[in-house]
UniProtKB/Swiss-Prot annotation:
Any one GO molecular-function label of the UniProt entry: phosphatidylinositol-3-phosphate binding
Comment on protein domains: The PX domain binds phosphatidylinositol 3-phosphate which is necessary for peripheral membrane localization to the perivacuolar punctate structures.
GO cellular component: cytosol; early endosome; endosome membrane; phagophore assembly site membrane
Protein name per Swiss-Prot or TrEMBL: Sorting nexin-4
Species this chain originates from: Kluyveromyces lactis (strain ATCC 8585 / CBS 2359 / DSM 70799 / NBRC 1267 / NRRL Y-1140 / WM37)
Annotated localization: Cytoplasm, Cytosol; Preautophagosomal structure membrane; Endosome membrane
Length: 400
């Protein structure tokens, strides 16, 4: 990697306290339209936050560099690129940009929660540098994806000897993924139903307004209808606010957690690939040793007809046998070294993954707890507000 690339492997001395991703803005140039986000970083020892503007593609580059430089670490995932939104033009809609902003905020929070990734120099550069565009151009073509390719190629191979810890981790991940996916579907249906209820309430409110006009001569009845209609309008506004929170924040949090679990699965698959490499090398070494031992015992790996053909061709079988043995000894020695290296790599990678799983569990538990607590508080606030407002409506109805 070039000098600009070596920067990514260094640790930062800057202590980052918090990061806020906000203010998505639509930008236009002569050739393209895109969304930018303001990234505000609070740094220890500085009174004012450092603010920079980044595009989604800048986050993508940061993500790729972190994966490239830390293959054994669980780098949080970015929000998916919604292909349908891009085709329909909805990627510039308020809903799309706000949801993506929420996901990018989650991405940054997870990076800061990670014991090693939070110290990455590239993260500091991303958050504070005014020359990010120059740095980005200097890295063009240097990001490797070979590890991911290896995992895809060996997607149908399985580890022969899987540790019980990883069997349990996989089972727990699958179960959590299944439950969250079910929740995701339920809350998406809930958002649509509440939206439909809101539309029906608007129709009711419109009808009540018409009825109020018809009863203008009957002051008492007109006041009662107006009081009830005011309550209906307040209910519509509060219900829309609650539904927007569920749609823009809670549902996004669930989806981000599902993606986080998938990133963990991908890391475990990469760990499995290291184990598969070791197992395949070990099997190849065993076959080579057996073949050499057979030749030393005089049996050889060839059949009777092959021996006769070699004899008719004037090949000295004893010399050929010694030749094969020498080649096999060289191969066995080389494979023995490779197996030892592969075993060391697999074991070290496994240890790192176990550490990552532990950090994932901590971050996951905190996020789910905070997300559910915020959802519960939003509902509590909604019902408290409705009790207060409708109590006042009731007083108006009684005094009408």
């Amino acid at each position: 990697m070039s000098e600009s690339g070596t920067l990514t492997n260094k640790e930062s001395d800057t202590k980052i306290l918090s990061v806020l991703v906000s203010d998505p803005q639509k930008q236009k140039t002569h050739s393209q339209t895109y969304i930018t986000y303001q990234v505000s970083t609070k740094i220890d020892g500085k009174d004012e936050p450092n603010c920079v503007v980044r595009r989604y593609n800048d986050f993508v580059l940061l993500h790729q560099i972190l994966i490239n430089d830390h293959p054994a670490l669980l780098v949080p995932p970015l929000p998916d690129k919604k292909v349908l939104n891009y085709l329909s033009g909805d990627r510039f809609s308020h809903s799309f940009t706000q949801k993506r902003c929420r996901s990018l905020q989650t991405f940054m929070r997870r990076l800061l929660s990670h014991s090693e990734l939070s110290k990455s120099r590239i993260l500091e550069t991303f958050l504070t540098s005014t020359d990010w565009d120059v740095y980005r151009r200097s890295l063009t073509g240097q990001i490797s994806t070979s590890e991911v390719s290896d995992v895809l190629i060996n997607a149908f191979k399985h580890v022969n000897r899987q540790r019980d810890e990883f069997v349990e981790i996989k089972e727990k991940s699958e179960k959590l993924d299944h439950n969250l996916s079910h929740l995701d579907k339920l809350f998406h249906k809930s958002v649509k139903r509440v939206d439909l209820i809101g539309q029906n309430l608007k129709k009711l409110q419109s009808s009540l307004s018409g009825l109020q006009e018809l009863c203008c001569d009957e002051k008492e009845l007109s006041n009662s209808i107006k009081a009830f209609n005011d309550g209906t309008m307040q209910l519509i506004d509060s219900l829309n606010d609650l539904n927007k929170y569920v749609d823009y924040e809670y549902n996004v949090d669930i989806k981000d957690m599902i993606n986080y679990i998938e990133a963990l699965k991908q890391l475990i698959r990469l760990k499995d690939q290291k184990q598969i490499d070791y197992e395949e090398l070990s099997e190849y070494l065993t076959r080579s040793i057996n073949e050499k031992n057979n030749l030393l015992s005089g049996y050889g790996s060839g059949n009777y007809f092959k021996s006769k053909l070699e004899e008719l061709a004037g090949i000295n079988q004893e010399m050929a046998r010694r030749d094969k043995i020498a080649k096999l000894e060289t191969r066995v020695q080389s494979l023995t070294d490779e197996v030892e290296k592969s075993k060391q790599v697999a074991d070290e990678f496994e240890k790192e993954v176990l550490k990552e799983v532990e950090q994932f569990e901590q971050i996951k538990t905190l996020e789910l707890k905070d997300s559910l607590a915020a959802l519960a508080q939003k509902h509590i606030d909604f019902y408290d507000d409705m009790v207060e407002k409708w109590s006042k409506i009731e007083e108006r109805l009684e005094s009408a």
